[in-house]
Amino acid sequence: GCRQCGGGCNKHGKCINGKCKCY
């Protein structure tokens, strides 16, 4: 899995299939 998703996504991120996706 992924940890602290959204830290580098301007606090807008989602963990999908073990990867952090920004939106």
From Swiss-Prot:
Keyword Secreted: yes
GO MF entries: potassium channel regulator activity; toxin activity
Source domain of life: Eukaryota
Tyrosine amide, modified sites: 23
Stretches assigned to coiled coil: none
Keywords, alphabetical: Amidation, Disulfide bond, Ion channel impairing toxin, Neurotoxin, Potassium channel impairing toxin, Secreted, Toxin, Voltage-gated potassium channel impairing toxin
Subcellular localization, as worded in the UniProt entry: Secreted
Role: May block voltage-gated potassium channels (Kv).
Family affiliation: Belongs to the short scorpion toxin superfamily. Potassium channel inhibitor family.
Name of the featured protein: Peptide 2412
Species the sequence originates in: Tityus stigmurus
